[in-house]
Design a protein with these regions (language model features):
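Signature of multi-pass transmembrane helix bundles
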Residues: 2-240
Length: 240
């Protein structure tokens, strides 16, 4: 028997009744790669908001006319199928202008456009929240979403959403390395870490980072708006 033969081949034992141990060689990922993966996680979770919001807005324009964008929220909230709106007045270039549609088409178009607008309003918050989730897991979601909302409020847009998502994820991840008392451990991922991370990220955005990031976002928008046709084509080739 092999147990009595000193020259018999030995097989390394595995704890747990023969189940193979998981490979750990792929766990040593650098921080740059880890942040890149988290950003891609945020983008992948943001895409459904883009798809739903963009398509609903386009359907609203198709049904209610392009000018439904100026009155969609008011019409959707103030009127109903039993109280259809007349043509609505909105301001365009300082002059009162009537919408091109009225009645059922205006109301349905306004409902679609309003839903699309509500969906698009979540883009930056979703991007930031799920970047933080990609870095820190569940404790990073709330701080990331709140940081994204602050980014929108201060005008930092997508640049701010990227920054707040990464910040929230890294701060929440650091808090998870702490070793609290046993009686506090159950509250850490659902209360303590989200609370402290939100405070850190929100304070940094409102006090320190918000205005510079908003200026960078404004500069980027102005640069893209001022591009000529040839420059736009070149940028498209570079971006791919």
């Amino acid at each position: 028997a092999a147990t009595q033969d000193p020259k018999a081949q030995r097989v390394a034992g595995v704890a747990g009744g023969g189940a193979a141990a998981p490979a750990t060689g792929g766990g040593n990922i650098g921080w740059g790669k880890r942040i890149q993966q988290a950003v891609m996680t945020g983008v992948s979770y943001m895409i459904p908001f883009v798809a739903a919001g963009g398509l609903l807005t386009a359907l609203g324009f198709l049904i209610g006319g392009y000018d439904v964008a100026f009155v969609s929220s008011d019409v959707a909230l103030k009127f109903s199928l039993w109280n259809l709106p007349d043509a609505q007045t909105y301001q365009l270039a300082g002059a009162d202008t009537l919408t091109s549609h009225a009645g059922l088409s205006l109301y349905i178009g306004a409902v679609f456009a309003a839903l699309g607008s509500f969906g698009m309003n979540f883009l930056v918050a979703a991007l930031s929240g799920y970047i933080a989730f990609g870095l820190a897991g569940r404790p990073g979601i709330a701080p990331g979403f709140i940081g994204g909302a602050v980014s929108v409020a201060v005008g930092a847009g997508f640049i701010g959403g990227l920054v707040t998502g990464i910040l929230a994820g890294l701060v929440a991840l650091w808090f998870t390395t702490l070793r609290p008392p046993r009686w506090l451990a159950g509250l850490m991922p659902v209360v303590i870490i989200p609370l402290l991370t939100t405070l850190v990220v929100g304070a940094l955005m409102l006090i320190l980072l918000g205005r510079p990031l908003a200026a960078a976002m404004t500069g980027l928008q102005n640069w893209l708006t001022s591009m000529t046709g040839a420059s736009a084509v070149l940028l498209g080739i570079i971006v791919g």
